[in-house]
């Protein structure tokens, strides 16, 4: 559930792991990130899609059967939230089990989110706000590493001659 949520919202792992249930606005498909949990110490709002909403609703039903923790992703024994290092270790373990490259990290989900948003036509200003960057320049430096294949696909849907 955390993996899906990070991929669909662009949140950092630390932001996602510290979420409280009250940070969610399921009906509006949004999450209000508290300033103390963001890298830049500035509150922001992120969003998620319909599929993620359905998964989150099921997760909440499951979670509530096992713990009364206020955290969205609690550790059952303590009621605290899952620690970043524990999630990273499990993430790496599951990559290995699936035969995937262990070089992937949870932050790759954020990178993938940003790249897919750009490839799907989102403007860089909106993306920068969603990612919580202090400026568009930060977003450009971090996420504009498109491959030739990426550029080719984008070009084909925007070719000036194709639309004459």
Regions from the PLM with identified roles:
Residues 103-107:
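Catalytic tyrosine of NAD(P)H-dependent dehydrogenase/reductases that use a Tyr as the general acid/base
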Residues 9, 14, 18-58:
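Conserved tyrosine-mediated DNA breakage-rejoining catalytic core shared by Y-recombinases
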Residues 37, 131-156:
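Catalytic-site neighborhood detector that most strongly recognizes the C-terminal catalytic loop/helix
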Residues 17, 88, 139-140:
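Key DNA-contacting residues within the recognition helix of helix-turn-helix
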Residues 49-101:
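Active-site/catalytic core of tyrosine-dependent DNA strand-transfer enzymes
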Residues 4, 8, 108-134:
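C-terminal catalytic core of tyrosine-transesterase DNA break-rejoin enzymes
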Residues 24-26, 101-102, 122-141:
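Short, polar N-cap/turn motifs at the start of nucleic acid-interacting alpha helices
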Residues 158-164:
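C-terminal secondary-structure termini that scaffold catalytic or DNA-interacting sites
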């Amino acid at each position: 559930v955390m993996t899906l949520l990070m991929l669909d919202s662009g949140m950092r792992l630390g932001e996602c792991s510290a979420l409280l249930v009250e940070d969610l606005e399921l009906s509006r498909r949004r999450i209000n990130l508290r300033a103390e949990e963001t890298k830049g110490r500035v509150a922001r709002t992120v969003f998620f899609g319909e599929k993620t909403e359905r998964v989150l609703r099921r997760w909440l039903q499951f979670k509530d059967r096992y713990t009364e923790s206020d955290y969205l992703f609690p550790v059952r024994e303590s009621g605290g939230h899952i620690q970043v290092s524990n999630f990273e270790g499990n993430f790496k373990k599951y990559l290995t089990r699936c035969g995937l490259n262990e070089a992937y990290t949870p932050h790759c989900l954020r990178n993938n989110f940003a790249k897919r948003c750009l490839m799907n036509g989102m403007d860089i200003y909106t993306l920068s706000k969603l990612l919580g960057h202090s400026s568009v320049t930060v977003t450009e430096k971090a996420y504009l590493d498109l491959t030739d294949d990426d550029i080719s696909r984008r070009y084909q849907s925007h070719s000036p001659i194709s639309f004459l």
